[in-house]
Amino acid sequence: MQKIKFSRTELKNRAATALLTAAPLSVMLLSAIYNLAFESFGYDITSGIPVLLSCLTVIALIAGTVLAAVYKKRFPAVFFALLFLMCFICYACFCASGTTDIYADGFFEALMLILSVPVWSYMPLAAAITSQTAAPAMIITGVIALSNVGVALWLTLSGRKENNV
């Protein structure tokens, strides 16, 4: 059996990439599960803890994007860019369809089951901003998606430029 050896630098790089991906993702999942459970029991999602968790999620996602840029880690930025772009497109189509029930339209059912988790992680924050939760949720999703796309493109283009020098 062959042992896999990593240099210290390579181990640090892998650990940083894993941490930059796992930390915001775990905060997002925890917040979404709590918020969905909180709402399913009939409680008001604009109360303190759900809004606080939503703020924590947005801060963790933005901090993850900033740290990905600082440490030049492209994978977390690309991962979250793709996740939130898909979420933004799906949520925009869902809002444009005019349906008020996630499960009313068969086309969006599978996508919304998967992509509702990121949106629900900060939906109480959107609901606390205004009673029309669609617009703030779309804005938050768009900002997170575009910031990650920008970082991913910047890291990709700067990496190519350094390799061509």
For the regions a language model picked out, list residue spans one by one.
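Canonical alpha-helical transmembrane segments
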Residues: 53-81
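Transmembrane alpha-helical segments in integral membrane proteins
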Residues: 60-71, 136-163
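Transmembrane alpha-helical insertion/packing segments
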Residues: 1-58
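Interfacial non-cytosolic loop connecting adjacent transmembrane helices
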Residues: 37-48, 94-138
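Transmembrane helix-loop junctions in multipass membrane proteins, especially transporters and channels
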Residues: 36-43, 69-73, 99-104, 156-164
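Membrane-interface starts of transmembrane alpha-helices
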Residues: 45-52, 56, 79-86, 131-143
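Transmembrane alpha-helical segments of multi-pass membrane proteins
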Residues: 9, 14-25, 76-94
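Helical transmembrane-bundle signal
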Residues: 24-32, 57, 61-64, 84-91, ...
